[in-house]
Amino acid sequence: MSDKSNIATLDSTLIDRLPSSSKTLFEAKATKSLTFESIAQELGRSEVAVAALFYGQAQASAADIEKLSQILEVPQSKLEAELGGFPDRGRAGPMPPVEPLIYRLYEIVQNYGYAYKAVLNEKFGDGIMSAISFSTKVEKEVDEQGNNWAVITLRGKWLPFSRF
């Protein structure tokens, strides 16, 4: 359990654009005062991946559904019905850029943006990551099979919103 002020909840303005599973998952998460990190530890997944599940931007495996049912105390049959299909990603976003690489970066933000926001808010509170006090790096990795992987690191100063 965690401090309720650090628990990411579902923005009600998004409900109509998200799958029904989002409301189910977020309500149970809030009721149990769980963070994405604590749920991720139980699922054996990253917290961003778990947040993406909650926003309907990632596919849940049968094992994910079974474990989420236990953690959140939501009937497994309900989660199977709501999470059993393929995700309908990126529905809330505007028309994307057309340049292929930029489009892929935009696609990452579409698919994981709300998940990142939720996890960042849980870790830092209400605020934004600066794109001015900011650094990024791109690295190339080659795996054991010889496949190339792009590694993009984003590092931004956390700027809390001011109360006025």
From Swiss-Prot:
Q: At the top level of its lineage, which domain of life is listed?
A: Eukaryota
Keyword Cell membrane among UniProt keywords: no
Describe the task this protein carries out: Catalyzes the reaction of cyanate with bicarbonate to produce ammonia and carbon dioxide.
**Species for this entry:** Sclerotinia sclerotiorum (strain ATCC 18683 / 1980 / Ss-1) (White mold)
Gene3D superfamilies from the xrefs? Cyanate lyase, C-terminal domain, lambda repressor-like DNA-binding domains
EC numbers, comma separated? 4.2.1.104
Per its UniProt entry, what is the enzyme's top EC class, as one word? lyase
Catalytic positions are 104, 107, 130
**NCBIfam families attached to this UniProt entry:** cynS (TIGR00673)
Its UniProt entry gives the catalysed reaction(s) as: cyanate + hydrogencarbonate + 3 H(+) = NH4(+) + 2 CO2
Q: Which residues form the signal peptide?
A: none
Q: Which GO terms describe its biological process?
A: cyanate metabolic process
Task: Supply the SMART domains for this chain.
Answer: Cyanate_lyase (SM01116)
Q: Which Pfam families match?
A: Cyanate_lyase
- Show the GO MF annotations: cyanate hydratase activity; DNA binding
Q: What gene codes for this chain?
A: cyn1
Descriptive protein name: Cyanate hydratase
UniProt keyword annotations, A-Z: Lyase
State whether keyword Lyase applies: yes
